[in-house]
């Protein structure tokens, strides 16, 4: 038996959410097939490492959010999510604006409960001429404290890093130290420095 996490994948219409998930979970390139709007779907990805329990990512594919009007996700997605993956097309600036609004909406929902939910952003269609500048997007991601990956649904290898990042962040979180050595604690005369440990 393995451990599972639920990842909700959201973004505007026609940004390639389903194409990304089909490539990751089914090893199928659907980028050349006619566009079919997604209502919702679920995919599973198994992460396996020797001598470790199986880890399963349950990826929830959602209908594309409208390019106009207020942002809102189904309550069931918000309640179930262990992480969010926000997708925009680097060839469509409006889809980037919607991701910015989605990020702020998610922050407001989880800010009420003081709960931190990881958010990863995918800049899809990196193989097309970009209208969203890469440096601008990375600057935005740093300011919003999210991890940004530039990917293309045509290339499965470009998608591997974000899957491993999401899984590792959930199943193997690193403990951030709450203490730091200040200058007052460091003795210049002592040849045997003390070590502070975070428990």
From Swiss-Prot:
Kindly indicate whether the keyword Lyase belongs to this entry. Answer: no
Keywords for this protein:
GTP-binding, Nucleotide-binding
Q: Which InterPro entries match?
A: KBRS (IPR042227), P-loop_NTPase (IPR027417), Small_GTP-bd (IPR005225), Small_GTPase (IPR001806)
Motif Effector region: which ranges?
35-43
Where, by residue number, does GTP bind? 11-18, 61-65, 124-127
This protein's record includes keyword DNA-binding: no
Swiss-Prot/TrEMBL GO biological process terms: negative regulation of canonical NF-kappaB signal transduction; Ral protein signal transduction
Q: What does this protein do?
A: Atypical Ras-like protein that may act as a regulator of NF-kappa-B activity.
**Domain-level remarks:** In contrast to other members of the Ras family, the members of the KappaB-Ras subfamily do not contain the conserved Gly and Gln residues in positions 13 and 65, which are replaced by Lys and Val residues, respectively, and are therefore similar to the constitutively active forms of oncogenic forms of Ras. This suggests that members of this family are clearly different from other small GTPases proteins.
Q: Could you tell me what this protein is called?
A: NF-kappa-B inhibitor-interacting Ras-like protein
Natural source organism: Caenorhabditis elegans
User: What lineage is on file?
Assistant: Eukaryota, Metazoa, Ecdysozoa, Nematoda, Chromadorea
